């Protein structure tokens, strides 16, 4: 994917918002009570697309300050079906990622959306989006990283292949690098053992030929 394509994706999704100082409590702040029960219980498997999504937030420093990424991953194919990038970690970050996933996938009613107990995922706005699209919320336990291990594995790959490869002077250049890696490398070039050595896009195309999933 050309850099101009990555710029277009960022522009179309409104990821060039004005930057401001981070406010409120961070992701590592003490988790609050769950809004949903843990329906996944570390069973990160799905018989088809849009049955189980995982979501979480990661952050990385730039010369201008931190940049936050919220991603939504379909367990069936390991594809990142929605994501949002911003300079502030507010509930809107998680809401935009979930809305992007719904817009891309279409028929998602009944899909379980699993997260940790971060305030962004317990927010009224996020819970409202779940209800509006007939999605089923699920939350892991406090301090149990393994409860969302399949999502953390994606962030570990992102950190190794993008975030820690160099220092980033601006948020814009890191945004471009993240979008390019997800859309060009992770989705279309990186073969995964659990997908029979196929990429996420190949796996969905081959295993679900009758389903018109966006590429």
Where are the regions that the model predicts?
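Charged DNA-binding/catalytic regions of mobile-element recombinases
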Residues: 1-215
């Amino acid at each position: 994917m050309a850099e101009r394509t990555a710029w277009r994706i960022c522009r179309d999704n409104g990821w060039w918002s004005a930057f401001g100082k981070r406010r409120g409590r961070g992701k590592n702040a003490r988790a609050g009570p769950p809004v949903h029960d843990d329906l996944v219980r570390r069973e990160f498997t799905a018989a088809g697309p849009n049955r189980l999504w995982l979501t979480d937030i990661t952050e990385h420093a730039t010369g201008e300050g931190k940049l936050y990424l919220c991603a939504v991953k379909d367990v069936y194919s390991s594809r990142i079906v929605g994501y949002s990038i911003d300079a502030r970690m507010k509930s809107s970050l998680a809401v935009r990622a979930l809305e992007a996933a719904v817009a891309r996938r279409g028929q998602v009613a009944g899909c379980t959306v699993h997260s940790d107990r971060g305030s962004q995922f317990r927010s009224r706005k996020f819970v409202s989006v779940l209800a509006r699209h007939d999605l089923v919320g699920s939350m892991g336990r406090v301090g149990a990283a393994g409860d969302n291990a399949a999502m953390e594995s994606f962030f570990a790959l992102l950190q190794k292949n993008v975030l820690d490869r160099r220092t980033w002077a601006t948020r814009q250049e890191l945004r471009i690098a993240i979008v390019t890696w997800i859309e060009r490398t992770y989705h279309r070039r990186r073969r995964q053992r659990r997908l029979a050595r196929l990429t996420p896009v190949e796996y969905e195309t081959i295993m679900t030929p009758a389903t018109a999933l966006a590429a």
